[in-house]
């Protein structure tokens, strides 16, 4: 049978569509830049789909802190989490609302299973990762989006969608930002109200009742738009939509560099400044007699704050600052400390981990002095868990210490420590904190506190819009959504603003990205050759 040229073009387009779907569906394509959050493990998994009421996915699940969960707005979204031991991808299926970690509004808190936690950390050694790196990614599910309808029972005992109906989705690769409907006889699309993991429509006073056929329009968090035309559907049955969000990567438009790999979050600039910053503990210190974390022995020194640490260290005793879940040392250049010691000593050591050999140059005496320790002399591992000051002599000393501060390398990102929503753009930063050394905020036991320079806190930059536009999150412009099915997207806007945090080295992911680019170019080359043969 002879195939005409039009059929050749249809075959080529079909091949392109299939290959792009296979490439992108199997990858976790980046949908945001990197942020920092916190993670904790749990033995109890969400049952019955959690608050999102989603079917159990093929990947791990997560419950988000109350403000991050945002009333279910992040149901079904997937995130790649980075800890000291590796990475894992989880899908949001639930929220949590009890306990400080769940109710604070300053940072994302991921509650994940012990199994998933142990892919990135060690649940038998610590129960938090305070410097968690995270990034929204496509879920990598195969197949199409599934849709399920529900309505009210009519007088005949059958489901009636005329005045009220619900709709829920599953197996979507990109989070759903909003859903709109246009029924027969309606003059314009109507936005459905989100109800945790589902969406609800009610006939408005004086409005038209829902008549079929109708069209649903789904807008993804990346601005993509899918339309679904349907006649009256059966209730409570999962229906294959025959469509899927396609992550935009390769030759398709993507505002996120797929070769940039997120690492763990940076530590706060200060370990101690009047108080311990968020995530640091001193309970692993040893052989001491007096330990005061808020001593007033400042000697009216103008370079000190209101409080200092005072510690009577016995012979071979140590002050240990420990951070659960570890911290990366990649961007640490030096450590600065204000310190005085009585009696004077030449035997105070500083090291990462359990032991070390670096001796702080002395003598350290009864006058306050600032010391600077190059991180390189401490022989750091890629990820460390503690920093200690050790009295390596046979007699006791009294040590006062304050303003324990990291100095970051020029390559360190000049952004705030906490990015609670990496898909939006934050307010402009004060000029005083643009440098790497000053661009990290201090934290208290709950979350963010402002540093001396001041940092604008960003909890959620998305707007609760009713017109189909995306959250500006500080003024960045929105972009017109792109329909997957090829229809015009003139009346639908998808906000997808973001900003950079930091990168880490990951050659395997870079190779995977390079492979996808290479495959895309090979595909184009094949198409060009076919066209040359045809013409």
Curated annotation (Swiss-Prot):
Glycosylation sites: 24, 122, 257, 292, 506
Disulfide bonds: 34-75, 78-139
Cell compartment(s), UniProt: Membrane
UniProt membrane topology term: Single-pass type I membrane protein
Listed PROSITE patterns: EXPANSIN_EG45
Stretches assigned to the Extracellular side: 26-514
Keywords, comma-separated and alphabetical: Disulfide bond, Glycoprotein, Membrane, Signal, Transmembrane, Transmembrane helix
Transmembrane portions of the chain: 515-535
Keyword Endoplasmic reticulum: no
CDD domains (UniProt xref): DPBB_EXP_N-like
Gene3D superfamilies: Galactose-binding lectin, RlpA-like domain
Domain Expansin-like EG45: start-end pairs: 31-144
Region of interest (Disordered), residue spans: 459-487
GO cellular component terms, A-Z: membrane
Annotated InterPro entries: Expansin/allergen_DPBB_dom, Expansin_CellWall, RlpA-like_sf
Residues annotated as signal peptide: 1-25
Family indicated by similarity: Belongs to the expansin family. Expansin A subfamily.
Entries under PANTHER family matching the protein: EXPANSIN-LIKE PROTEIN 9, PTHR31836
Protein purpose: May serve to lubricate the movement of the cellulose microfibrils during cell growth and wall extension and/or may serve to maintain the fluid state of the slug cell wall.
Protein name: Expansin-like protein 9
Organism encoding this protein: Dictyostelium discoideum
Underlying gene: expl9
